[in-house]
Amino acid sequence: DEPLPGAVEFVKALRSRGATVMYLTGRDIPRMLKGTAESLRSRGFPVDVDGVDLVMKPVAALDDALFKRDVLREALKTHSRVWLFENEPVNLNLVARDLPQIGLVYIVSTHSGREECADTLSRIEHFEVDAESF
């Protein structure tokens, strides 16, 4: 997967302001950890540094949406604000229903087509912003 325009700079800007960054993916550790970490690293994303976590499913059989919801529920215990930037409506809809205190941003991109996102969610197609503005 190629990163959306501005994504690397956006993540680096968040880190420079002290935010914890979590790459939360439905990929599984046994088959995909090495390749996922290398893919992020090779594209310029911070990986293996303080304040950055790559969180993947321990086994492939876990449902992506439930896994992500449960990880985010745990994140709420240690972080005052949690945001999910996500391209899959199934995941966003579940989190919106079960964890309404999480900020949600729909990344308009290819997805499963199983559900549509709520019209009320913020939507983006890229991360190109003036880094000084956030």
Name what the model sees in each region.
Residues 1-5:
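Metal-dependent phosphoesterase signature
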Residues 6-18:
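Catalytic-core regions built around general acid/base machinery
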Residues 17-20, 28-134:
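C-terminal cap/substrate-recognition subdomain and adjoining C-terminal extension
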Residues 25:
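Conserved phosphate-coupling serine/threonine residues in phosphotransfer and NTP-handling enzymes
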